[in-house]
């Protein structure tokens, strides 16, 4: 039987993997966006685990709001990525300072 601690450890591992992914690869914006999405997944896992443990649905409802914000964040991030690639022919984060306006 899986307990709350198992889910919290899973969430902590996912969160740590996303932080490592952001700090080790600061150049590629696609990897950074994927790491941020993984971080939000870890937070959602903890919300659902606590919600189930406490017998309350508020945590599960909050997950839907987080998923909505994550979808909007991914869409905006990919739009910025497409603009960056069209202007500079690269997806390197260090080249973002060359964009003006």
Swiss-Prot record:
Pfam families xref list: Oxidored_q2
GO biological process: ATP synthesis coupled electron transport
GO molecular function per UniProt: NADH:ubiquinone reductase (non-electrogenic) activity; quinone binding
Record's subcellular location: Cell inner membrane
Listed EC numbers: 7.1.1.-
Enzymatic class: translocase
Keyword line: Cell inner membrane, Cell membrane, Membrane, NAD, Quinone, Translocase, Transmembrane, Transmembrane helix, Transport, Ubiquinone
Domain of life the protein comes from: Bacteria
Endpoints of the signal sequence: none
Catalytic activity: a quinone + NADH + 5 H(+)(in) = a quinol + NAD(+) + 4 H(+)(out)
A GO cellular component entry from the record: plasma membrane
Membrane-topology descriptor: Multi-pass membrane protein
PANTHER family membership: NADH DEHYDROGENASE SUBUNIT 4L-RELATED (PTHR11434:SF21), NADH-UBIQUINONE OXIDOREDUCTASE SUBUNIT ND4L (PTHR11434)
Family: Belongs to the complex I subunit 4L family.
Its job: NDH-1 shuttles electrons from NADH, via FMN and iron-sulfur (Fe-S) centers, to quinones in the respiratory chain. The immediate electron acceptor for the enzyme in this species is believed to be ubiquinone. Couples the redox reaction to proton translocation (for every two electrons transferred, four hydrogen ions are translocated across the cytoplasmic membrane), and thus conserves the redox energy in a proton gradient.
Name of the protein in question: NADH-quinone oxidoreductase subunit K
Species: Burkholderia vietnamiensis (strain G4 / LMG 22486) (Burkholderia cepacia (strain R1808))
């Amino acid at each position: 039987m899986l307990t709350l601690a198992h889910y919290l450890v899973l969430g902590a591992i996912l969160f740590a993997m996303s932080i490592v992914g952001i700090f080790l690869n600061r150049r590629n914006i696609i990897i950074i966006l994927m790491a941020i999405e993984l971080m939000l997944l870890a937070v959602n896992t903890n919300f659902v685990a606590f919600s189930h443990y406490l017998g309350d649905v508020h945590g599960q409802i909050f997950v839907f709001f987080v998923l909505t914000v994550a979808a909007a964040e991914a869409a905006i991030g990919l739009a910025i990525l497409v603009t960056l690639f069209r202007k500079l022919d690269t997806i390197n984060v260090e080249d973002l300072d060359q964009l003006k306006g």
